[in-house]
């Protein structure tokens, strides 16, 4: 394992001067030490590329070898590496995040209030939102926050993603759903989620973990597709969100229909843009399976990598979900970029565009404000 951070293009202007005289320009750029207090800059032009790389059942078996192998396959360093931290493990993934940061990538952590056996469609478990709101898990939250603070480097954290679906135990359908609350003029399911989200963020910030940027991460379309369950109902407010995130999946199972990128992104993207006029948007998960009789995966990937940067200008990062699994009917869902030669070639070609940034842009933070 490397002992020094390997940021290939992390030199960014912390103090740049630009003078123009006729056709002459002079730019002075000061080097940024990634081991010092820094923050990740949202790119004005282009977008970061990233991946989740099939890190095991609990999505946390991060290794440098897996990251480097993936980068060799796709032909570009990854600016963002995603992994999970399930509450059932009751720990903070310090070792994983060190591997990612020392490799020169930004950790994206899905912090999920989920207990073993980590199966979907089972309903709430011991980490239910009501207990979180009541403070039952404050000791764990505080310890996690302390470890995040002590990690000391930037990371993005998602608390309870895809809450507008019906598959995770924190989904709004389990917490009152469409029951109307006259006092708040809102629905009980989303209100309970927002209360839990704010409680968690407040406690983490209260422990001094200012190196965390928070992402509000929804599924592109809501299930059920009812007004009460639309993403805006769950939005905890601009003070609690730094990034807006979307999951965008094409066909994952053999009996699902094929769908192109505009049909998956157009309306959800506009919905996110209306939530906040300025916050950056991330395609926090995107992938499709290899189903040649349904549609061409290579063309789907090509379309995604083109349109994310041209049709949707507020998208500033996209994280591919590189995973393969076997279903109960013995069929496979192969979302990996190299599920076929055509798929891999499309991904490599799209990622080769310089607008897809494989290296982080960093800005130094004065030590007085980095505490």
Question: What are these model-predicted stretches?
Answer:
Residues 20-22:
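C-terminal motif of bacterial Sec signal peptides marking the signal peptidase cleavage site
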Residues 38-57, 155, 280-371:
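Substrate-binding cleft of secreted/luminal carbohydrate-active enzymes
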Residues 96-212, 335, 365-369:
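Substrate-binding cleft of extracellular glycoside hydrolase catalytic domains
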Residues 160, 197-229, 278-291, 319-323:
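Aromatic-lined carbohydrate-recognition surfaces of secreted/lumenal glycan-active proteins
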């Amino acid at each position: 394992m490397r002992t020094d951070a390997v940021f290939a293009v992390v030199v960014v202007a912390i103090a740049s001067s630009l003078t123009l005289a006729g056709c002459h320009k002079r730019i002075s750029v000061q080097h940024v030490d990634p081991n010092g207090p820094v923050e990740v800059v949202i790119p004005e032009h282009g977008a970061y590329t990233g991946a989740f790389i099939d890190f095991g059942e609990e999505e946390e078996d991060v290794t440098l070898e897996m990251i480097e192998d993936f980068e060799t396959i796709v032909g570009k360093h990854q600016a963002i590496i995603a992994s999970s931290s399930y509450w059932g493990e009751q720990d903070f993934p310090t070792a994983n995040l060190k591997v990612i940061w020392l490799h020169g990538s930004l950790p994206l952590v899905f912090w999920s209030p989920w207990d073993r056996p980590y199966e979907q469609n089972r309903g709430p478990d011991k980490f239910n939102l009501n207990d979180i709101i009541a403070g039952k898990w404050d000791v764990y939250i505080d310890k996690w926050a302390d470890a995040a603070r002590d990690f000391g480097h930037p990371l993005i954290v998602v608390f309870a993603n895809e809450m507008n679906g019906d598959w995770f135990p924190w989904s709004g359908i389990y917490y009152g759903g469409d029951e109307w609350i006259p006092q708040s003029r809102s629905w009980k399911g989303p209100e309970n989620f927002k209360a839990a989200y704010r409680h968690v963020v407040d406690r983490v910030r209260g422990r001094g973990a200012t190196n965390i940027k928070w992402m509000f991460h929804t599924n592109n379309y809501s299930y059920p597709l009812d007004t009460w369950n639309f993403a805006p109902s769950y939005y905890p407010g601009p003070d609690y969100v730094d990034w807006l995130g979307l999951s965008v999946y094409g066909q994952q199972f053999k009996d699902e229909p094929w769908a192109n990128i505009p049909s998956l992104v157009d309306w959800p993207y506009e919905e996110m843009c209306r939530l906040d006029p300025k916050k950056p948007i991330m395609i926090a998960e995107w992938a499709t399976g290899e189903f040649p009789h349904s549609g061409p995966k290579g063309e789907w990937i090509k379309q995604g990598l083109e349109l994310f940067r041209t049709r949707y200008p507020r998208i500033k990062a996209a994280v591919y979900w590189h995973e393969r699994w076997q279903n109960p009917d013995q069929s496979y869902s192969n979302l990996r970029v190299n599920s076929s030669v055509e798929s891999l070639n499309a991904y490599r070609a799209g990622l080769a565009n310089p607008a897809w940034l494989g290296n982080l842009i960093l800005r130094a933070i004065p030590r007085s404000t980095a505490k």
